Amino acid sequence: MSAYVSTRRVGAFASSRVAPQDDFSVLSQQLGQGFFVLSRKNAIEKILTKEEKIMAEEKKIPYKIYLEEDEMPKAWYNVRADMKNKPAPLLNPGTHQPMTAEELEGVFCADLVAQELDNENPYIEIPQEIRDFYKMYRPSPLVRAYCLEEKLQTPAKIYYKFEGNNTSGSHKLNSAIAQAYYAKKQGLKGVTTETGAGQWGTALSMACSYFGLDCKVFMVKCSYEQKPFRREVMRVYGASVTPSPSMETEIGKKINAEHPGTTGSLGCAISEAVEVAVKNPGYRYVLGSVLNQVLLHQSVIGLETKAALDKYNIKPDIIIGCAGGGSNLGGLISPFMGEKLRGEADYRIIAVEPASCPSFTRGKFAYDFCDTGMVCPLAKMYTLGSDFIPSANHAGGLRYHGMSPVLSQLYDDGLMEAVSVEQTKVFEAAEQFARVEGILPAPESSHAIRAAIDEALKCKETGEEKTIVFGLTGTGYFDMVAYEKFHEGQMDDYIPTDEELAQYAAKLPQVNE
């Protein structure tokens, strides 16, 4: 402590600075005889101003904020209950009428259909069996990116919710275990699904292994070839893995015939998985993103994030998530969006998507098929067209032509923003993050990192001390081919032209709303 005791330090007890002398005598004189100074530390604590106490508390924020097990969410949050403008209903692809529960149950598990159609209940209880499973890897940490802040020399405070501490290496296990639980409860033999980068397929494989279910995975062909070890992890858990489009389904044969040499897409893989599910008794289709039920399960991310922030009285200014189909983004923002919808708080929410697959930023808000084969229900969403096949970029989990109907409605209502970024810029951010934070991020997650860094640098220019929270959805240890391409200068930034997108948009189904 300085020999000078400023007016700011002793508050109302001092009217001016005093001459240099012993700290204890100064404090004793100015605080009066009724105050017994035990030590230098006690004296300083007693005279801290409110501002300084806040600063002191901020210094106590740990690098990682963990919740206790008993603080984990006991119910999922259903943001649709608080939406004034509800997402448009799924439509039967043949009749263009709203899908009934009975129709949906031919494809999905019955309990999941009930969750899909529930627009009223704000909270849905998490079954105890699922909560017990969550304890294997949850709660996940909310990390203060002190090292990244220092590297950027920004006044912004950066936090990230890290979802990579489980066998799938991502957030996907949050919904996989829930969907496998309901399939087992229904007495099914097994499930089918699609996977892009492989995290969802890995998560579902593990969940099915846990509950003793058969698991058939159709993996987007470019990822199947780029990430051979990811498919081997799925096989460790007993799943069968097929590159999509394949020659095992009628849809796959048709797509291969129409697009020779295609690298596939999530839309293709969905079509194949649905075909196999409906043709085989005792099977149902489950999915890793897009639909309401998945965003519901992923709300554990946002609920934990908010609880961790509340522990330290932290209110974020900006919340950022990568966006492919919307599962991670929807889960991360859900409780914050709920507050925004109810008028209790305001946040700036940013979706980040690849420039090669810009559903939000360049797509149309319209009804479209959820799959390339046009066998799934029609959903009203931001879409590039169901037959749009993105370039073979290295963010396989974001290569989807559409977007969650929930997020699409929120975006259309002006409640969130969206930006698209080129993959070379994404990998620059990924490498910068890895070198200071010690985690090799997945390419998908790195889209959010790119936007978070950009926002932090804006704060550096303006001097604003904004609090930024982003979702680090998973790790990139199976994405080394992508990192190799980046380091060797072999990574391209393909961006579809307006003419290309117009051609796909012209093929959107005509629906009378």
Regions found by a protein language model. Give the residues of each.
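Active-site nucleophile and cofactor-binding loops and adjacent substrate-binding regions
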Residues: F162-L173, V191-W200, I320-G325, E353, ...
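Claisen-condensing/thiolase-fold acyl-transfer catalytic domains that form or cleave C-C bonds
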Residues: A323-G331, Q423-E488
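Active-site/ligand-binding loops adjacent to catalytic centers
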Residues: Y123-E125, I255-Q293, I301, N313, ...
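N-terminal amphipathic/hydrophobic targeting modules at extreme N-termini
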Residues: A3-A12, S16-R17, V26-Q33, V37-N42, ...
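Positively charged, low-complexity intrinsically disordered leader regions
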Residues: K60-L188
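Alpha-helix C-terminal capping segments
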Residues: A178-L188, T202-D214, R235-V236, I333-G343, ...
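Active-site-proximal loop->helix
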Residues: T192, W200-T263, S359-D371, M480-E488
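A short, small-residue-rich loop immediately preceding and capping a beta-strand
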Residues: S175, A183-C222, K315-L329, I349, ...
